[in-house]
UniProtKB/Swiss-Prot annotation:
Statement: the UniProt record of this protein carries the keyword Secreted: yes
Family as reported in the entry's similarity comment: Belongs to the mycobacterial PPE family.
Changes seen on gene knockout: Cell envelope-associated glycolipid phthiocerol dimycocerosate (PDIM)-positive mutants with simultaneous deletion of PPE31/PPE32/PPE33 genes have a growth defect in Mg(2+) restricted media, particularly at mildly acidic pH, but the PDIM-negative mutants grow normally.
GO cellular component labels: cell surface
Compartments, as annotated in UniProt: Secreted, Cell wall; Cell surface
Function: Virulence factor that modulates the production of host cytokines. Interacts with host TLR2 receptor at the macrophage cell surface and induces the secretion of the anti-inflammatory cytokine interleukin-10 (IL-10) and the pro-inflammatory cytokines TNF-alpha and interleukin-6 (IL-6), via coactivation of MAPK and NF-kappa-B signaling pathways. Also increases the expression of IL-12p40 and IL-32 through activation of the ERK1/2 signaling pathway. Can induce cell apotopsis in macrophages via activation of caspases and increase reticulum endoplasmic stress response.
Descriptive protein name: PPE family protein PPE32
Highest taxon of source: Bacteria
Keywords: Cell wall, Secreted, Virulence
GO annotation terms (biological process): intracellular magnesium ion homeostasis; magnesium ion transmembrane transport; response to host immune response; symbiont-mediated activation of host anti-inflammatory cytokine signaling
Self-association state and partner proteins as the record states: Interacts with host Toll-like receptor 2 (TLR2).
Length: 410
């Protein structure tokens, strides 16, 4: 503690009047009171919630454990609320102490007036006539000194008592900090144990079923049960393979990079398809009967150069085949029908067909159809022959002859 008695009243009074006053202390007291109210409300809410859960909807060992874990925290909230309320009350006491000390302190203007009077009396004390007044002024100044020192001593003691607060404690640890990591480890261990136990169980079942299945196969009378046993064995094998090669197994995860290689190969294959498509869609020279259209490969009809003069035509020069009007070239190209004997000298005339077999394979109606087919084939071949343009006139190809062989019936 400072020795306020050794300090003149100018310093003590100046310090008291230079500060912000009791306003910050009163604001701190109000803040502490608000915090205490919120903590009391939180403690009441916690308590009512836990009581409501453990009484009706949630009962049993878990609810008891949870209530026991939360109880220390609720108690800490209540204790902290009381401490906050006490801090607010002490802040109010400190503000009151300051007001008391401020009222007991001599105002600085009074001290300044005393000092000014003393200087004036000393300056005018030529013959000693101001000596009593100077003594009275000094006595008044000593009283102000003592008054400020007493006020400061009282304020220091009271403020020290008001500022002694109980230390706040940290909230208790109601949860296990390593619970999350432990839970993750337990879950992973349980998952691995479940997977390994599943595969082990399937293998054990397969090994136990294999002897009985082989024994049942040795007996023909139990074929049905043997097939049922094999079904069980195959099902066990399928389950084991599914666990080993599933989408989330090590083998399944190892196949993921292969998909990228497959996609990369398909992208490279796209570049190799371009030359084949270009060769397929590219222009080609016309051949055969389409060779006259070769100038069109450039895509422009104007590239065709006329071959000789223009084509000529005539009117009223057609001939008739029955009631059908056909070009003259058809009649000129039609072959002359000759007998088989004239074409093949070694072949004699065909014997007369028996009248009693009109429905035979080589009857009159069948033979007449052969002759009709010969005429039709000649007309079709003559009409379907490719025409050539030369010198402005159309010339027909020479029609090929058709030989008809008549086989006598037995």
């Amino acid at each position: 503690m400072l020795d306020f008695g050794a300090l003149p009243p100018e310093i003590n009074s100046g310090r008291m009047y230079a500060g912000p006053g009791s306003g910050p202390l009163l604001a701190a007291a109000a803040a502490w009171d608000a915090l205490a109210a919120e903590l009391y409300s939180a403690a009441a809410s916690y308590g009512s919630t836990i009581e409501g859960l453990t009484v009706a909807p949630w009962m049993g060992p878990s609810s008891i454990t949870m209530a026991a874990a939360v109880a220390p925290y609720v108690a800490w909230i209540s204790v902290t609320a009381g401490q906050a309320e006490q801090a607010g009350a002490q802040a109010k006491i400190a503000a009151g102490v300051y007001e008391t000390a401020f009222a007991a302190t001599v105002p600085p203007p009074v001290i300044e007036a005393n000092r000014a009077l003393l200087m004036s009396l000393v300056a005018t004390n030529i013959f000693g006539q101001n000596t009593p007044a100077i003594a009275a002024t000094e006595a008044h100044y000593a009283e102000m000194w003592a008054q400020d020192a007493a006020a400061m001593y009282g304020y220091a003691g009271s403020s020290a008592t008001a500022s002694q607060l109980a230390p706040f404690s940290e909230p208790p640890q109601t949860t296990n900090p390593s619970a999350t990591a432990a839970q993750s480890a337990v879950v992973a261990q349980a998952a691995g144990a479940a997977a390994s136990s599943d595969i082990t169980a399937q293998l054990s079942q397969l090994i136990s079923l294999l002897p009985s299945t082989l024994q049942s196969l040795a007996t023909t009378a139990t074929a049905t049960s043997a097939s049922a046993g094999w079904d069980t064995v195959l099902q066990s094998i399928t389950t084991i393979l599914a666990n080993l090669t599933g989408p989330y197994s090590i083998i399944g995860l190892g196949a993921i990079p292969g998909g990228w290689w497959l996609t990369f190969g398909q992208i490279l294959g796209l570049a190799q398809n371009a030359p084949g498509v270009a060769a397929l869609l590219g222009p080609k020279a016309a051949a055969g009967a389409l060779s006259p259209l070769a100038p069109l490969r450039g895509g422009y009809i104007g590239d065709i150069t006329p071959l000789g003069g223009g084509a000529t035509g005539g009117i009223a020069r057609a001939i008739y085949v029955g009631s059908l009007s056909v070009p003259q070239g058809w009649a000129e190209a039609a072959p002359v029908m000759r007998a088989v004997a004239s074409v093949l000298p070694g072949t004699g005339a065909a014997p007369a067909l028996a009248a009693e077999a009109p429905g035979a394979l080589f009857g009159e109606m069948a033979l007449s159809s052969l002759a009709g087919r010969a005429l039709a084939g000649t007309a079709v071949r003559s009409g379907a022959g490719a025409a050539r343009v030369a010198g402005g006139s159309v010339t027909e190809d020479v029609a090929s002859t058709t030989t008809i062989i008549v086989i006598p019936a037995d």
